[in-house]
Regions:
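Extracellular/periplasmic metallocenter environments
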Residues: 2-8, 12-25, 33-35, 40-55, ...
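Long, charged N-terminal interaction/targeting segments
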Residues: 27-32, 60-63
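Short acidic/polar alpha-helix capping motifs at helix-coil junctions
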Residues: 32-38, 72, 84-85, 99-102
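N-terminal edge beta-strand
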Residues: 51-83
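Hydrophobic residues in beta-strands and at strand termini
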Residues: 63-65, 78, 88, 103, ...
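Solvent-exposed coil/turn segments that connect beta secondary-structure elements
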Residues: 66-68, 83, 89-93, 106, ...
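Beta-strand-rich interaction surfaces with strong enrichment in secreted/lumenal proteins
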Residues: 73-76, 108-112, 122
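Histidine- and aromatic-enriched segments that form or immediately flank copper-ligand environments
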Residues: 87-118, 141-148
Length: 167
């Protein structure tokens, strides 16, 4: 019969590294960020504050990122030619957990959003389709789960704005 001598992650294996209350390391960290210090006018401070708003041909997506998901993560009702502003707030508070953001078909580069920060980007979809968005900066063992989709409908479509948020 074999005895387990040690249950410990190997180098580069982060599965066990995320079960620690921030209060245990706060005094040892070089930098932490309080969400209350984020003064960006487009910031949201919780997943429940996320939303998608249409004003004519302009759509504002107020989104959050945290290991290992975006909220909202599935968005419908965007139309070809809309000016879509994605306002992404990184809800992480420890300095070393940035999140990236890119959409297939972006005409500009990705965003890199540091903990506690909000960054915005403009996207104008040029064709109908389903466009994946994803995190471009490795953040945790479930990094590949950080993705979602935007469905773009034809101009004048009756598809209403809809999106997923936590219950």
């Amino acid at each position: 019969k074999m005895n387990m001598l040690l249950d410990f992650p190997t180098v580069g294996e982060p599965h066990y590294a995320q079960a620690l209350p921030a209060s245990m390391i706060r005094d040892k960290q070089i930098r932490t960020y309080s969400l209350s210090e984020n003064k960006d006018p487009y910031a949201v401070r919780s997943e429940k504050e996320t939303r998608v708003e249409r004003k004519g041909n302009v759509v504002h997506i107020y989104m959050t990122s945290i290991r290992s998901h975006f909220v909202p993560d599935n968005i419908e009702g965007i139309q070809v030619g809309d000016s879509v502003y994605v306002h992404l707030t990184n809800l992480e508070q420890d300095w070393d957990v940035p999140h990236g953001f890119a959409v297939l078909g972006f005409t500009n580069s990705e965003l890199l959003v540091m903990p506690g920060q909000t960054r915005s980007v403009l996207w104008i979809p040029r064709r109908v389709g389903v466009f994946p968005f994803y995190c471009t900066d490795f953040c945790s063992a479930l990094h590949q789960e950080m993705q979602g989709y935007v469905r773009v409908s034809p101009r004048g479509s009756a598809v209403p704005i809809s999106f997923n948020t936590p219950k």
